[in-house]
């Protein structure tokens, strides 16, 4: 069976396995985790900077105001979201309907025909750049911190507008990009990456950013799926003191992308040895100087696609999640305002890459929509030392800092001496993103970075949601519980479903599958060129609900606790990786007969990847030396690094004689997860396996 066929079979099995493993009677396995004290937010007046001190007030007047507005967003979404959209966004043509109503409940938006702000017209770039450049042209839009300390610079809204307009003309006239075309972007975290996205949206094209850590094979697949004729990249990247051959990776990918006509190359390092293939490749600066510094926006409909972002799916084939323009922008803007209590005088630092949704929403679009300053950081938290984040925060007087728990665990492990000497008093809000944050990391973050004075917003959301689903709200609004994402954002109606029956659990303490009962403006509209897959992945598993793929608990106060993925996706360092995609890469190796990939807990990255591998010729390892075994494992790890990227490489390879399977041939990955978690005594009844004797062999193999 081919890797793609194996992946498709996994999709069919996936939901059933979720239900199979929940056949036992309901119990409160995680209730003890939710028994934590409430941490109330404290006044932050003494942290206000001079440019905001005289007129600052929170956007919401406490928890009761949140509850009132939340109730309105659920009971009267038409009024709530129309007022917000008209108040905070500029429209070239006003919308005449807020959403397509549900057939059975006209006051509720429809999942099947999810569309918002119908017949309205606007432009993303105008809302992010033009309107601020007109009002406050000299205000700083972007602060750039290069990989090497001291090499950065700032850019005003006026300068940003001029550069965006020039790149928009490169796209339109030098590269023949038209409204509705997709443009692939493979760039490091530099201002030119933001300029690129804004220029693409300015002419009504659709950007498809590929994280610059993906391999050439992964990049190739995403370019081909999106049908991009144009790729924008850099010659090289700087990260952690190392040079990354960005353009070489693009060149390798383009060997199998016949439709690509042009590549625009920004010379980040100006290395003359980097391949430049004329006339296909165009030089950023040479082209930019050809064009004037103003070029008008292209009005687009509210539902016009803004971008595709490929995310890992349970079948292994990456999904091009498609976001629309108006709904996505409103979600980004409202969460900036209410989650982080952002004001236009603020400096917002998201330590996330634009290759992921966090960088899209909270480095590019959210801050610029709101008219504040966004900080773009090219480097890593450990270079040149573990003080880098804190140095940046003090240097630029950052007011909101947003980072993944993986980075916090790394910095906590490095020791508090790296924090000594830094004030960090400009901060008013700390954020966590990408994975659940453990209570002890939350407390360290609050104590050492926030001085126990400022809120931590532990945000839960996804590529598909576009913006926050469940989160505390800063500005003195939400009492916090360390480890909990807390309460749903406006318009988000969360429910806990019984995984077996699909029925809502309304107990005071509920555990099950987290689902959303109604669509919201920033919810993804489809999967690019595959709406059936969108329905099968998100809306069909539990009819009438959006299936998040996460398990969750809801405590007696209504707070949501995320318990992790219930599908075949592993969350490594806040990045969702498809186990099926990793399996497919390993199975393609000529030595391998079968493979099963699962996630397991890791102190640093949250989860790590483990691969259980059956070789075609078992004799090749049954009598092999330890050195030969290590060579086999290294070879398989390198296979994944090359096919997908370094971040997807398994931390553990276990060579085994066989895998645990049902009589129908389905691999029971649940058993592998239990063994890795040290829960071999909790496997349940394994007599239904076609090969029950393999369980002891697996346990012994992991011990080895």
Swiss-Prot record:
State where ATP binds: 434-436, 458-463, 550, 565, 576
Renumbered to this chain, motif Microbody targeting signal spans: 702-704
Q: Supply the Pfam families for this chain.
A: ACAS_N, AMP-binding, AMP-binding_C
Q: Which CDD domains match?
A: ACS (cd05966)
Q: List the catalysed reactions.
A: acetate + ATP + CoA = acetyl-CoA + AMP + diphosphate
What keywords are annotated for this sequence in UniProt? Answer: ATP-binding, Endoplasmic reticulum, Ligase, Microsome, Nucleotide-binding
* The EC number(s) this enzyme carries: 6.2.1.1
GO:BP terms for this protein? acetate fermentation; acetyl-CoA biosynthetic process from acetate
| UniProt entry tagged with the keyword Aminoacyl-tRNA synthetase | no
Locate the residues binding CoA.
239-242, 358, 573, 641
Matches recorded under Gene3D superfamilies: 3.30.300.30, N-terminal domain of ligase-like
List localization entries: Microsome; Endoplasmic reticulum
GO MF, one annotated term: ATP binding
GO CC annotation terms, alphabetical? cytosol; endoplasmic reticulum
Tell whether Ligase is among the UniProt keywords: yes
Name the family the entry cites.
Belongs to the ATP-dependent AMP-binding enzyme family.
Give the protein's recorded name: Acetyl-coenzyme A synthetase 1
Q: What is the native source organism of this protein?
A: Candida glabrata (strain ATCC 2001 / BCRC 20586 / JCM 3761 / NBRC 0622 / NRRL Y-65 / CBS 138)
